[in-house]
From Swiss-Prot:
Keywords: Ribonucleoprotein, Ribosomal protein, RNA-binding, rRNA-binding. It comes from the Bacteria. Transmembrane segments: none annotated. Part of the 50S ribosomal subunit. GO terms for molecular function: rRNA binding; structural constituent of ribosome. Pfam families: Ribosomal_L6 (PF00347). This is Large ribosomal subunit protein uL6. The keyword Metal-binding does not apply. NCBIfam families: L6_bact. This protein binds to the 23S rRNA, and is important in its secondary structure. It is located near the subunit interface in the base of the L7/L12 stalk, and near the tRNA binding site of the peptidyltransferase center. HAMAP family: Ribosomal_uL6_B.
Amino acid sequence: MSRIGKVPIPIPDKVNVTIKGQAVTVKGPKGELSREITPEVAIEQADNLVTVTRRNESRIARQRHGLSRTLIANMVEGVSKGFEKKLQIQGVGYRAQVQGRNLILNVGYSNPVTIEPPEGVQVAVESNTNVIVSGINKEVVGNTAARIRAVRPPEPYKGKGIRYADEYVRRKVGKAGKK
C-alpha cells in the first residue's frame, strides 16, 4: 500500500469537491481547478474526506496511487490557500519590473527579456530584485518560476543570476592568477 496514497485528503469548509467518473473538480475561495485522474485508481468522497484507492494491484496502479492522491490534495490546497514561489535576482544592474501582466527582466543581456505568465498566474515584484510568482495551480506556478529562473540561472563563480529564494548556490573558486 502506498504510504502517501492511503492517507485521506481533508476538505476545508469553504472548498467543494465534485467527482464525476475520473474527473475531479475542486471549487474554493480562490478559484476552480479540474483534472482527469488516471483510471487505475478509484476516488471516493465521504463527509469532509476524499480517499483514493487502487482498482487492482498492477504496477501502473501502484505507481499512480500516491501521485493521484497528491494531485487532488494540491488542487484542494491551491483553491483554499494558493501557491507561491519566490525568486531573487542578484547581480549589478540586474532588476525586474512588471508592465501590465508581463514581467520584464534586465539581467545583463543587450535587450530586456519579457516573460508573459500563463492564465491564472500572477507575477509581482518587490524592491526590483525579488519576484513572487503566485496562483492556484502548483504545477503552473512552478513551471512559470522555472521559466523565469532559466533566463539567467545563477552562476557558481560570482553568484550572479536568478535563483529561488531558498536555493543555495554552490560557489567555486576561480582559477589562480599567474605567478
